[in-house]
From Swiss-Prot:
GO terms for cellular component: cytoplasm. It catalyses: N-terminal L-glutamyl-[protein] + L-leucyl-tRNA(Leu) = N-terminal L-leucyl-L-glutamyl-[protein] + tRNA(Leu) + H(+); N-terminal L-aspartyl-[protein] + L-leucyl-tRNA(Leu) = N-terminal L-leucyl-L-aspartyl-[protein] + tRNA(Leu) + H(+). HAMAP family: Bpt. Its EC number is 2.3.2.29. One of its GO terms (molecular function) is leucyl-tRNA--protein transferase activity. Keywords: Acyltransferase, Cytoplasm, Transferase. It comes from the Bacteria. GO terms for biological process: ubiquitin-dependent protein catabolic process via the N-end rule pathway. It comes from Marinobacter nauticus (strain ATCC 700491 / DSM 11845 / VT8) (Marinobacter aquaeolei). Functions in the N-end rule pathway of protein degradation where it conjugates Leu from its aminoacyl-tRNA to the N-termini of proteins containing an N-terminal aspartate or glutamate. Belongs to the R-transferase family. Bpt subfamily. It is an enzyme of class 2 (transferase). This is Aspartate/glutamate leucyltransferase. The keyword Transferase applies. The gene is bpt.
Length: 237
């Protein structure tokens, strides 16, 4: 059984940064041969690691610390006016958690989302193998939040259950329903689910000040950032 003291880590060679142009990044990975159970996964997440399929990673850049792990203190969260509007707008959705697994209807929504929203990114073109390796493989206590409208799947959020919270992995939605703000709605739903389970945190991954697509994370308050090995409430001024 692996534990933090026995884990082996590997660093990648420098590669193009996925978030900031004209920068190089280095990524630290946990040895993929290690057995990661829920307890160890929770400990790694609290240390700033994220899961992508069966891989656990953290930025390890020599000259840049722009990627900041953040988590929401769900017990102190109160939705603002815009977030309350999103909740009202999506009150007609049927939402349920199901075990993370491959299905064609999940993949169709995923592929549609990637093709319409991320054609210029490294996830294009989508494939069934990509979906499975990213969202299904390596799952420890992993779930999909189904969001359906009149029986049709319109949103899917991958979420992991940890010892001290939930970890929001990835969300896709029908691009033609962008006006519903389903990404925001998925986070709000996960906040309420963490509260229901009496878990203190929702881990939101990395916040990058200079990356516009990461800015949404600071709309959820109070948010904590992991800096210098300690979680502290983050000022967004």
């Amino acid at each position: 059984m692996s534990n933090l003291r026995t884990l082996v880590f590997f660093a990648t060679p420098p590669h193009d940064c996925s978030y900031l142009p004209d920068r190089e990044a280095t990524t630290m990975f946990v040895d993929p041969r290690a057995h990661i159970d829920k307890k160890l996964y929770s400990q790694l997440t609290a240390l700033g690691f994220r899961r992508s399929g069966s891989h656990y990673y953290r930025p390890h850049c020599e000259s840049c610390n722009a990627c900041v792990p953040v988590r929401l203190q769900v017990g102190q969260f109160e939705p603002d006016r815009n977030q309350r509007r999103v909740l009202r707008k999506n009150a007609d959705l049927d939402c349920k958690l199901v075990p993370a697994a491959f299905s064609e209807r999940y993949y169709r929504l995923y592929a549609h989302y990637i093709e319409e929203r991320h054609r210029d990114g490294d996830m294009y073109p989508p494939s069934r193998e990509q979906f499975t390796s990213f969202l299904v493989e390596g799952a420890t206590d992993s779930w999909f939040l189904e969001m359906s409208l009149d029986g049709e799947l319109v949103g899917l959020a991958a979420v992991d259950l940890l010892d001290d919270g939930l970890s929001a992995i990835y969300t896709v939605f029908a691009p033609e329903l962008e006006h519903r703000s389903l990404g925001t709605f998925a986070v709000l739903w996960q906040i309420e689910e963490a509260k229901r389970r009496e878990l203190p945190h929702l881990y939101l991954g990395y916040w990058i000040k200079e990356c516009r697509k990461m800015n949404y994370k600071t709309r959820f308050q109070p948010i904590e950032a992991l800096r210098d090995g300690h979680w502290r409430e983050m000022s967004t001024d």
